[in-house]
Structures are given as C-alpha cells and as structure tokens.
Amino acid sequence: AAEPGLSALGQFLKAVRATPAWVEACMRLRNRVVRWFGLKDLGGLSDLDPQRPLQDYRPGDRVGIFTLLENHPDEVLLGDRDRHLEVVLSVHTTGGGAAMPTGPVVVTITTVVHVHNWLGRLYMLPVAPMHRRIAPAVLRALG
C-alpha cells in the first residue's frame, strides 16, 4: 500500500524499486531497438542507487529512466527529452503523505507526452499500448 508519511518522490522510488522483471526486459528490448534510430538508451526503470537517501535527490539528477525536474513533498515532476518526444511524469500525493499526514494516502500519476516529429508518432504506436500494461504493473507496489 502507499506508505503514510512518504513524499511523492518516495512513493515513486518505492514503486520503481519493485518493477517486475518482465517490465525491465521490455526496457532492455526498447533500448536495443531505439539505438538503431539514434535515440537514447534510457537504462532500466529501477536503475537506482539503493543506498542513496531520499533527501539527497536534487533537480537534474537521474532517477531510473527519468531526470528529476522538481521535487516537493506532495508532488514530484520527472521527465526526459529526446529528439522524437518529451515526456513529463507527475507523481502527486494527498492524505497521509508528507504534506498532509492524516487520512489514507492517494497517489495520482499523470504523464504528458509531447511528440516532436514523425519518429515520435511512430515510436508511440507500440509504446502507448504497452504503457497501459506497464504502468499498473509498476504501481502495484503502492497497493
């Protein structure tokens, strides 16, 4: 379940640390394929330093496949930009989190993708349906 008292970044890290092996296998396949098109190898979703304290994360740091853009107790913005698209992920917490310590924890994940060109549109054809399976599988760690 979502952990009371844990910041939005903490909730995100908890979820990605429990990334299923099949999701990481999909990321490895994705990274091999996109290199043929000159796109970035993002690594794995759970590529994190397990010893790094939560308070040591700063904007600009890599957090798995994303760059930390903004970090507030109740919301974290993560993103990545490549020549084909830009993505921003928001993890927002209410109730029981660091900003509001009473009540059940509700974690809301929102993703915005800006496609830059035909390559981005082509890329999203297989990626969008896969994300409908991957996102719930990763978020199961939060309950």
Predicted region positions:
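Hydrophobic/basic alpha-helical segments enriched in Actinobacteria
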Residues: 68, 104-106, 141
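Hydrophobic-ligand binding "helix-grip"
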Residues: 55-101
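A conserved amphipathic terminal alpha-helix motif
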Residues: 122-143
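Hydrophobic pocket/interface hotspot
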Residues: 11, 68, 109
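Short C-terminal domain-edge/linker segments immediately following a structured domain
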Residues: 27-30, 43, 99, 138-143
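Hydrophobic ligand-binding cavity/cleft-lining segments
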Residues: 1-48
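Beta-strand/loop substructures that line and gate deep hydrophobic ligand-binding cavities in soluble
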Residues: 83-125
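Flexible internal linker/loop segments at domain or repeat junctions
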Residues: 44-59
